[in-house]
Amino acid sequence: MAMANLARRKGYSLLSSETLRYSFSLRSRAFASGSDENDVVIIGGGPGGYVAAIKAAQLGFKTTCIEKRGALGGTCLNVGCIPSKALLHSSHMYHEAKHSFANHGVKVSNVEIDLAAMMGQKDKAVSNLTRGIEGLFKKNKVTYVKGYGKFVSPSEISVDTIEGENTVVKGKHIIIATGSDVKSLPGVTIDEKKIVSSTGALALSEIPKKLVVIGAGYIGLEMGSVWGRIGSEVTVVEFASEIVPTMDAEIRKQFQRSLEKQGMKFKLKTKVVGVDTSGDGVKLTVEPSAGGEQTIIEADVVLVSAGRTPFTSGLNLDKIGVETDKLGRILVNERFSTNVSGVYAIGDVIPGPMLAHKAEEDGVACVEYLAGKVGHVDYDKVPGVVYTNPEVASVGKTEEQVKETGVEYRVGKFPFMANSRAKAIDNAEGLVKIIAEKETDKILGVHIMAPNAGELIHEAAIALQYDASSEDIARVCHAHPTMSEAIKEAAMATYDKPIHI
C-alpha cells in the first residue's frame, strides 16, 4: 500500500492485477519446471548484486549470483565501507582516550595503539558479515557461483570458477552488478606498498610518519582521518579549488576548518606531475593546477583517492552489443534495462551516485520490475555521508544547486552549540541546515555536520522522499534531550523562528 501511494504521488502508474497475475504465473511455471535455466542471474555479489539476488529469490525467481572475489559483499564489505568504518571507529576511540576522556573525569595514561589488534578487529567484522550474506543466500535458496563471469550470449554466462573449472550459467534475465574500481592517475603506479589505493590503505602494517592523500573526496578524507588520528602527518593534495566539490559550500568551509584543527593539511588547486619511489619513501612533484612553480612533497606512503570508475573489464559487453557512455557507464532506462533484451545493469556500473545504498535500491527496484511490480529510485534523494569526526551528511540539493534552478527559497540553520544533548556530551561542533522552497515550504535539501550526522540524516531523507515541508518536521515531537532536536529547530528556523537560539 505504501509503495502504491508513493507511486501515485510521484505520478507513476501501477500495473494491473491481471498483469501481475500473469507475471507471477509465468515465474511459477518456470520455477517448477526443474529447468537448468535460471529466471535471474546476477554478475557481481556486492551490495547491489547480493541484495538483488535475495530479493529476486524472495519474489519466487530461480536465482544465481556469480562473484569473482570468492567472498560476497563486493568492494563495500571487503575493502571499502565496512573495513574503513571499523578503522574509523577504532582510531576515534584512541583519539578520544588521548584527548577527551580527561574532560569527563576519566584518567588514562600511556595510551598506545596496537595496530595488529586494530586490523584484527576490522578483519573479524568483515569475515562475520561476508559469512552472514552466504547464510542469507542459503536461507533464500540463491545459488552462489564463485568465479569470473563473462557473456557468451545475452542469456549465457561463461564462468571461470576459483576452483579452476569452467561452467556456463543460463538465465532469462541477466543483471550486471560488477561495481567499480579505483581510478588511476597518469604516471602514478599503485603498488599497494608505497603508493596505495584505498584497499592498501586499509591494510598498512605500520603507521606512516607522513601520509599524502591525492584526492579530497569522501574516501580520501576518511582514510586520512584514520591515520591522522593515530599519528600520521597527513597532507591532502586536491586538483580542484575545494574539498568534496559536491558538498554544500557553507558546510564545506566549516568541515575543512574542522579537519585543519585536527592537523590535516590541504594543498588545493594542486596537481601531481611526478613521482619518485627510488628512495625509502616517496617524493611527489606537484605544481598549481593551472601550471606554475613545482615543489616536492615527501611521504612514507601515498594514497591515491582520485575517484572510481565502472568495472566492466572482461564481461564481453562488446560481444553482445551493450551500450556504454564515454565514462564507461552502462546505459539503462528507468527499468534498468540495457539496449540488449534481457540484460540489465545496476549500481556503480550505471549513471548515478557511486554509493552502496544506491546500488542496493537499484537491485531491489530492478527485480521488482521483473516481477511486474513498481520499482523506483530517486537519485536526487539518495543521502551521502562522510564518516569523519564530525561526520557530514546530506540529502537533496545544496544551496548552490537550488540557486541555479531560479526557485525562491528559504534557509533555516541551527548550531549544535545550542543543542542540550550535544553540550551534555561535550561534542557540540557543527550545525543543521535546511533549504525549502519559499512558496510551498517543500524541503529541497538538508545538510548536517555533527558527530552522528550519518544517523540523523534519515529523518530528512524520509521528509524529502514524501515531499514534506519544513513545518511538517517542526511539528513532529522530538524526544529531549537528543541531537535530532537540532533538525526540528532548523525546520522551525526555516518556516518561522527557532526556540533555542
From Swiss-Prot:
The keyword Flavoprotein applies. Its EC number is 1.8.1.4. GO terms for biological process: 2-oxoglutarate metabolic process; glycine decarboxylation via glycine cleavage system. NAD(+) binds at residues 215-222, 238, 272, 307. GO terms for cellular component: glycine cleavage complex; mitochondrial matrix; mitochondrion; oxoglutarate dehydrogenase complex. It is found in: Mitochondrion matrix. Residues 1-31 form a transit peptide. It catalyses: N(6)-[(R)-dihydrolipoyl]-L-lysyl-[protein] + NAD(+) = N(6)-[(R)-lipoyl]-L-lysyl-[protein] + NADH + H(+). Lipoamide dehydrogenase is a component of the glycine cleavage system as well as of the alpha-ketoacid dehydrogenase complexes. The pyruvate dehydrogenase complex contains multiple copies of three enzymatic components: pyruvate dehydrogenase (E1), dihydrolipoamide acetyltransferase (E2) and lipoamide dehydrogenase (E3). This is Dihydrolipoyl dehydrogenase, mitochondrial. It comes from Pisum sativum (Garden pea). The gene is LPD.
